[in-house]
């Protein structure tokens, strides 16, 4: 599936309402992301270029990348040329020019294609390493962050900011897969070091699953946006980040990966549609053969998950999605919402002017929509099937009272209600 995506006028900034990321022309960025974590260390330059070309054609505009990889590569932390990231292993103050020059070349590939890179300087790794095939091995740089201390981490951050500050397509991400714990001082110093030499680039932070940077760094001046991370009740976590203070934009950085932990396409679609309709800015998917670039990963680039994300991106970019306000108060969908703490919850939102409403229904069932919250005397209903892209008319209805809808599709469905033509708002 080939998708046309509007180029983003970089650099990005936080919108005045603090809910979205916008480019220099004021267009909101809808994140349709992928997680090729080991792109720098476990692919050739030619393969990296080919991969990014494919993702761009599929509508992906964001990738997650580890700048340094601790475990998940053929010869981590070395790249395929055998270059170590540091001349003294584990010492963040000794960057190896050969390694970082190649990292620049890979980031140049993304920049040339208009792809935003969420760059991780020191992925911490899960505290109880148990990934199949890598059990008991440190997945990330937690111990090294602690050992380098604030001074070494600050120097590393300053180096990264000087080296990559000109890359307007970078968003920095601090930590990942683990809460700060004893690494807090080093991580904060690293973040401050990056900001001191690259002050115009945005920054987020990733915690353990089910935790938020809003809990651990509530008042950090360097924290521009939040990365929601959940394998469980995703809408609950998204609502938490929506309600956190101070207000910051957020996106779903990780959830179920394709071809991992018995995930299904329905799980992947649910995560994506919830990520917008629960107030966020989009979703980053992952795929097991691709994220660490296992042998044969090329055969999985045109996967079903990628096609689902392409349809997700195309659907929302055709609408003024950034005007949507999530229906946490249940004034739009009054019945059929699903279990409050379950995986079958609707994702529902309406525009602030009442001319657009969207409801994602994770399974086939009836829902009741209170049409009185919509503007205008009538609304047009359209059904969209996320798994195929098929559309079906839902009729024209008089706005005013409750209306019961049941999707014509066997699995998940999106109900689109419009009282006026929608303009493109994509990025």
Model-found features: residue ranges?
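Catalytic-core region of carbohydrate-active enzymes that cleave or remodel glycosidic bonds
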Residues: 220-294
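Aromatic- and carboxylate-lined catalytic core of secreted/periplasmic carbohydrate-active enzymes
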Residues: 260, 268-395, 406-426
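Proline-centered flexible-loop/turn and helix-kink motifs
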Residues: 165, 199, 246, 317-320
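Short beta-strand segments
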Residues: 173-175, 204-206, 227, 251-254, ...
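C-terminal edge beta-strand
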Residues: 1-5
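Active-site mouth of glycoside hydrolases
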Residues: 15-225, 229-236
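Carboxylate-rich, divalent-cation-coordinating active-site regions
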Residues: 10-14
């Amino acid at each position: 599936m080939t998708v046309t995506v509007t180029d983003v006028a970089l650099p990005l900034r936080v919108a005045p309402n603090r809910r979205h990321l916008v480019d220099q022309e004021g267009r909101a960025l809808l994140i349709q992301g992928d997680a090729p974590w080991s792109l720098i260390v476990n692919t050739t330059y030619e393969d990296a270029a080919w991969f990014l070309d494919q993702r761009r054609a599929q509508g992906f505009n964001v990738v997650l990348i580890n700048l340094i990889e601790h475990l998940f590569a053929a010869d981590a932390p070395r790249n395929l040329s055998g270059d170590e990231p540091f001349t003294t292993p584990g010492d963040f103050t000794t960057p190896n020019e050969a390694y970082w020059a190649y990292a620049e070349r890979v980031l140049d590939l993304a920049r040339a294609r208009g792809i935003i890179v969420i760059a991780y300087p020191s992925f911490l790794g899960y505290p109880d390493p148990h990934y199949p095939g890598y059990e008991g091995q440190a997945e990330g740089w937690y111990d090294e962050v602690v050992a380098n201390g604030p001074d070494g981490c600050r120097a590393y951050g300053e180096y990264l900011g000087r080296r990559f500050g000109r890359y307007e397509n970078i968003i920095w991400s601090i930590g990942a897969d683990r809460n700060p714990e004893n690494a807090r001082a080093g991580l904060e110093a690293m973040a401050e070091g990056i900001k001191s030499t690259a002050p115009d680039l945005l920054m987020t932070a990733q915690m353990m699953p089910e935790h938020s940077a809003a809990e651990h760094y509530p008042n950090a001046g360097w924290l521009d946006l939040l990365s929601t991370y959940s394998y469980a009740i995703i809408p609950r976590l998204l609502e938490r980040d929506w309600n956190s203070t101070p207000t910051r934009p957020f996106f779903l950085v990780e959830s179920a990966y394709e071809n991992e932990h018995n995930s299904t396409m329905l799980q992947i679609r649910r995560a994506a549609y919830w990520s917008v309709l629960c107030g966020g800015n989009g979703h980053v998917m992952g795929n097991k053969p691709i994220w660490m670039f296992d042998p044969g990963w090329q055969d999985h680039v045109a996967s079903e998950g990628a096609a689902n994300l392409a349809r997700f991106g195309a659907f929302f970019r055709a609408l003024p999605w950034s005007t949507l306000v999530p229906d946490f108060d249940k004034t739009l969908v009054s019945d059929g919402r699903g279990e409050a703490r379950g995986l079958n919850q609707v994702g529902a939102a309406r525009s602030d002017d009442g001319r657009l409403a969207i409801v994602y229904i994770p399974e086939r069932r009836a829902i009741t929509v209170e049409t009185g919250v919509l503007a205008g005397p009538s609304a047009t209903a359209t059904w969209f099937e996320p798994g195929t892209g098929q559309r079906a008319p839902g009729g024209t209805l008089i706005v005013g009272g409750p209306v019961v809808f049941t999707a014509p599709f066997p699995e998940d469905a999106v109900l689109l209600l419009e009282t006026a033509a929608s303009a493109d708002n994509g990025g």
